Regions:
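Active-site nucleophile-adjacent alpha helix/oxyanion-hole segment immediately C-terminal to the catalytic cysteine
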Residues: 2-56
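Catalytic-core signature of thiol
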Residues: 38-72, 78-82
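Deubiquitinase catalytic domains
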Residues: 13-16, 67-131
C-alpha cells in the first residue's frame, strides 16, 4: 500500500504497521493494546507484535477482515470495543480531507480507536485499517 500524505495521518497519534497487508485490522488492534510495550524503533514492524497475537482470539476470523467480521471478532474478544472513524480520501479534495466518526462496536469499557481508510485503485475499492 502506498503511504498516505495527510497532516492528520502524518502525526504521532496515528500510525500503521508496515507490511501487515491483509492483517492491517489485527495489527491495528495489537498496536493499540501493546505499542507502549514495544521499542519505538520497531513498533511499526509486524514482527514486534508476534508474541502478542496469541492474546487475541481470532478463531474463525478470515483476513483481510471485512466489516461483517468485526462483530464476530468482538464476540471472540469480549473485553474489547472498537470505535471506528472513516477516512475517505477520494470523496474530499486532497487539501480538505476529513475524518468522520462512524460508530462504536462492542460493550466493553476498553475502546480501541481504529481509522478505516477507503481508497480506490484500478477501479477497485480497497480498505486499510490504522491504529
Amino acid at each position: 500500500m502506498e503511504d498516505i500524505h495527510h497532516p492528520v495521518l502524518n502525526n504521532n497519534s496515528i500510525f500503521k504497521v508496515y507490511q501487515s497487508k491483509d492483517e492491517s485490522f489485527l495489527y491495528s488492534i495489537l498496536a493499540a493494546l501493546y505499542s507502549n510495550k514495544i521499542d519505538r524503533r520497531s513498533f511499526h514492524r509486524p514482527s514486534a507484535y508476534e508474541k502478542y497475537k496469541k492474546t487475541l482470539n481470532i478463531k474463525n476470523i478470515n483476513f483481510p477482515i471485512r466489516n461483517k467480521d468485526i462483530v464476530p471478532f468482538l464476540q471472540n474478544n469480549p473485553k474489547l470495543s472498537i470505535a471506528i472513524r472513516l477516512f475517505d480520501s477520494v470523496v474530499i479534495s486532497e487539501k480538505d480531507m476529513r475524518i468522520y466518526e462512524y460508530k462504536v462496536i462492542g460493550k466493553s469499557s476498553q475502546v480501541i480507536n481504529i481509522l478505516f481508510h477507503k481508497y480506490y485503485r484500478n477501479k477497485k475499492t480497497l480498505y486499510h485499517f490504522f491504529g
